[in-house]
Amino acid sequence: MKKYILMPVLAALSLSGSVIQAQDFDNNPVVNVSNSKENLNFTIGARFMMDGAYYHSDFTPVKSGAAITDARIRTSMSYEDWYFYADFDFSKGKFSQKNIFLQYSLEGAKGTHRFKAGYYNNPVSMANNTSRGSLHFISRSAAANAFSPSRELGLSYIFYNDHFFANQGVFAENKYNDQPSGYQGMSLGGRWVWRPINNDDRTFHLGAAFRYANIATGTVENNVLKTELDMGSSLETYVDATQDFLSAKLPWAKNVYDVGAEFLYKTDDFFARGEYMYKHVTKKRDDQALFEANLGSIDSWGSLESWQKGNPLGDNSFHWAYIEAGYKIFGDPYQYSNSDALLKGLNGRALEVVARYSYTGLNDLVEGEKYVPGRDQYYPNGVLADYPATSLSIGGGNMHSATLGVNYSFNKFAQVMLSYTYNRLDRDKFQYDKNFHVLQARLMFQF
């Protein structure tokens, strides 16, 4: 473990130059070592988050307590128009990589062009592309957590100027190609932003996003590859990050389409932003092979058509959205990044109050179907039957969440956050759990 920490430090010491401090400490680690003769710059930084949380629920307990929720070492190196960045996480007592990418920038007559390759966030979703260190909330919304793609191995092209931003790329389904069965699927994702107002005093942007993913990895059952899409979120908290209350599994998922819209408005002392996303999932399976595999068993059917009627397969659609706002009582003005089309975090001594509402829709229920808690499944036409009993309903849960928070930054390196979140859950599986109260605090420092 020690060698992973010492290697970037030794690399930094090997470079000659002076140590300076960067202004955007979240995106650029602050310890800089420069070699002007070679036009080379190396940075190293770290980030640590410690959370404490108290939970109150109607029936099923949630584990209150404290936890290390983020602990990272971050490094970067720039040479002329080339930039390399990597950060590594140790928060769960083990080493894991986060962002690792190489980027080439080219200044053009109409703006900046960037070419990016490595392991990083799919561009879809403004919230998911905002670093946790720049968030004005302890957690992203449950909506963004449940539906947004995470980091993926890919290639991207980015263009931006004062009024436009475009980020699109192609990505692999599995960064290690270590899936149990199947081959690498792929996805295409993009986010496009127009900034009709963008100056030192205020910024207003409107954006759109699209993603297509082809799922090609899974497990083999009866000599047939079974793909699956898993979605879920915690109760907008990290201390007990269980997704038991809000989650869904979509067997035989094949094609995933995400279409979204966003807005952002900020002045020196106020910001508001929000997103809406629609997700549609189509499914595919080898019915003939599964029908033949069941012949002669208790699950056998007389014909393929009767098997298909007893085992229907349908598409699913979901929706999610959030809106959040903040007011700065004192401190440096809110800042906006043209290169990322994102709101930056607090910088220097500051105090702010924030609020958010989010909706996460993981229910896609067929009218008339009945849920039986003892069997944890839905039954077609409201009829409880042992055979057949295949349902098209997805009961992952719908949740409304409202958050109020106060954030105080001592300086550009240390910050405390306090928030209260009320979650209202509607899920048949947890019929006695409707109300979840979350009171949590965070101590964060980074350099």
Language-model features: locations:
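Positively charged n-region of N-terminal signal peptides that target proteins for export
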Residues: 1-4
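Outer membrane beta-barrel
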Residues: 29-56, 60-216, 317, 322, ...
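Hydrophobic alpha-helical membrane context
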Residues: 14-15, 82, 287
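Extended ligand-binding clefts on enzyme/binding-domain cores
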Residues: 202-243, 248-252
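Outer-membrane beta-barrel and related beta-rich outer-membrane complex signature
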Residues: 127-131, 180, 216-225, 284-288, ...
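N-terminal periplasmic/intermembrane-space "pro-region" immediately following the signal or transit peptide
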Residues: 6-15, 19-47, 335-336, 374, ...
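Outer-membrane beta-barrel pore domains
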Residues: 59-60, 230-447
